[in-house]
C-alpha cells in the first residue's frame, strides 16, 4: 500500500458506485454513469482473501 499521505489521498479519496462499480470523485453526491445515490468509499484493505 501507499506509504505517504499524498499517495494515499490520491488513491483512496474516491467513491465507488454500489450499482455499477464506477469510480467517482470524492465530493460526488451521485454516480457519474448511472445516477445512483448510494456510493461507498474505496476500500483501504483488500476484500475476500483470494482463496
UniProtKB/Swiss-Prot annotation:
Belongs to the eukaryotic ribosomal protein eL40 family. It comes from Pyrococcus abyssi (strain GE5 / Orsay). PANTHER family: 50S RIBOSOMAL PROTEIN L40E, LARGE RIBOSOMAL SUBUNIT PROTEIN EL40. One of its GO terms (biological process) is translation. HAMAP family: Ribosomal_eL40. One of its GO terms (cellular component) is ribosome. It comes from the Archaea. Disulfide bonds: none annotated. GO terms for molecular function: structural constituent of ribosome. Keywords: Ribonucleoprotein, Ribosomal protein. The gene is rpl40e. This is Large ribosomal subunit protein eL40.
